[in-house]
Regions:
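Helix-to-loop junction immediately C-terminal to a conserved catalytic motif
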Residues: 48
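Catalytic Walker B motif of ABC-type/P-loop ATPase nucleotide-binding domains
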Residues: 150-154
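H-loop/switch region of ABC-family ATPase nucleotide-binding domains
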Residues: 184-186
Length: 234
C-alpha cells in the first residue's frame, strides 16, 4: 500500500500543485485521471521519491519514504514519461547498475532486456537510441528486483504494437499476483478492463473510487462520467 497523508506540493515559485492530499493506493491497477497539468505525474514523482513534499508524509507498506528510504524504495519501480538517462552509458551498463543497486544478479537485467526486445542493442549508448528504445530500457530496469509497486507514466507511449501487447499482458499478470500498479495515461482504454480503482485529480485535490463496475463498458462509461467531458479517455 502507498499512503499519502496530508501531502501538499508546489514547484519552485509556483502555486501549490497538490493540496492536503490523503490517499491510499491498494493492490491492483489504479488509474489516475484528470486534465493536463492537474498533478497526475506529480503524484507519481512524489510516490517514487523523485520529488519531496512541502508538507505531509508518504509511506510505502508502512515505511516512511524519507525516514526509511532504502527499504521503502526497494519495493518501488517508477517509469517517468521523459526518462533522464546518462547519454554516454550503454543500456547494459544502466541495467548492471540497477542490478547492483537492488542487489540482484546481472542475469536478471539481461532477462529484462530480452523481455523488451533490447538484448541485441545492449551495447548501444543512450544517445544512439530512439525515444521508444530509451523508454523500453527504463521499463526493463523497473522489472529488476521484482518490486511490488509500479508507478507508470504513459507506459504505452512510443512503444511498438507488439511491445504494447507484452506490456499489457505483463501488467495484467502483476495485478493478478497482488502488485499495486498505478498508471497515468492519455489513452486509458487498454487498461480499463484490468482497473480495480480510479483516482481523480482536479484543482490539486484527489478523490479515490475504490470500487469500479466489473463490466468493461459500464466501467469505461463510469470513468468518462468522472472526466465530465473535460478530456478524452478513448
Amino acid at each position: 500500500m502507498i499512503r499519502f497523508h496530508n501531502v501538499s506540493f508546489s514547484y519552485e515559485k509556483e502555486e501549490k500543485v497538490l493540496h492536503s492530499v490523503n490517499l491510499e493506493i491498494q493492490a491492483g491497477l489504479t488509474l489516475l485521471i484528470g486534465p493536463n497539468g492537474c498533478g497526475k505525474s506529480t503524484l507519481l514523482k512524489l510516490a517514487s521519491g523523485v520529488e519531496i513534499p512541502d508538507e505531509g508524509r508518504i509511506a510505502v507498506d508502512g515505511l516512511d519514504l524519507w525516514k526509511e528510504e532504502v527499504p521503502a524504495r526497494k519495493s518501488l519501480a517508477y517509469l517517468p514519461e521523459h526518462p533522464d538517462l546518462t547519454p554516454y552509458a550503454s543500456i547494459r551498463e544502466i541495467l548492471d547498475f540497477v542490478c547492483r543497486l537492488r542487489e540482484r544478479p546481472v542475469e536478471e537485467g539481461k532477462k529484462a532486456l530480452g523481455f523488451f526486445d533490447l538484448g541485441h542493442l545492449s551495447h548501444r549508448t543512450v544517445r544512439e537510441l530512439s525515444m521508444g528504445q530509451r523508454r523500453r530500457a527504463v521499463f526493463a530496469a523497473c522489472l529488476v528486483g521484482k518490486p511490488e509497486h509500479f508507478l507508470l507514466d504513459e507506459p504505452l507511449e512510443a512503444m511498438d504494437r507488439h511491445i504494447q501487447k507484452e506490456i499489457l499482458a505483463w501488467i495484467g499478470g502483476n495485478t493478478r499476483s497482488g502488485a499495486a500498479v498505478v498508471i497515468v495515461s492519455h489513452w486509458i482504454e487498454p487498461f480499463v478492463d484490468m482497473a480495480s480503482a480510479a483516482v481523480t485529480v482536479h484543482n490539486g485535490s484527489t478523490f479515490c473510487f475504490e470500487s469500479l463496475p466489473p463490466d468493461y463498458e459500464k466501467k469505461l462509461a463510469f470513468l468518462e462520467q468522472l472526466a465530465e467531458g473535460e478530456y478524452p479517455l478513448r
